[in-house]
Design a protein with these regions (language model features):
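Short glycine-/small-residue motifs
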Residues: 123-126
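Secondary-structure boundary/capping motif
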Residues: 20-23, 113-114
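Short hydrophobic beta-strand elements that form part
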Residues: 13-14
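Vicinal oxygen chelate
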Residues: 1-9, 33-81, 87-117, 129-130
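Conserved active-site tyrosine of GNAT-family acetyltransferases
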Residues: 22-27, 92, 121
Length: 130
């Protein structure tokens, strides 16, 4: 066994201070399929990966404690087809989501991207390669 055997990201856990709002965001705004739902653990399927939410504080194996003031949020990137970036932008605006950066081409990355935030202030990117 070695670290070279890692094949993919199985799941990502977002530590939440606003669990209800964040659950609603990923279910209702993003439209992700709810796989498991409890007060302390919510999982959505996103392709082969699970996006999981849990409250900050004591958990199954450890206590992350309160958010560190001034700490950076994470960035989650979700890949779509090139025409879908602009369609996602229109859908998010219609749902009242504040856009951090509207659809923009990033030639050095060969990406078209769109950025916004979830209720926990994590940066969410919708991107497409071109």
């Amino acid at each position: 066994m070695s670290l070279k055997e890692i094949r993919n990201v199985d799941y990502v856990v977002l530590l939440c201070g606003r669990m209800k709002e964040t659950r609603a965001f990923y279910k209702e705004v993003m439209g992700f399929c709810l796989e498991y739902d409890s007060d302390k653990w919510v999982s959505f399927s996103v392709g082969p990966t699970l996006l999981t939410l849990r409250p900050r504080g004591p958990a199954l194996a450890w206590d992350d404690g309160p958010a560190v003031p001034g700490s950076a949020a994470i960035q989650l990137a979700f890949r779509v087809s090139p025409p879908a970036v602009d369609a996602c932008h229109a859908e998010l605006v219609a749902k009242g989501i504040a856009i951090v950066q509207p659809p923009t081409d990033l030639p050095s990355w060969r990406h078209r991207t769109l950025f916004f935030r979830d209720p926990e202030d994590n940066i969410i990117e919708i991107c497409a390669e071109y």
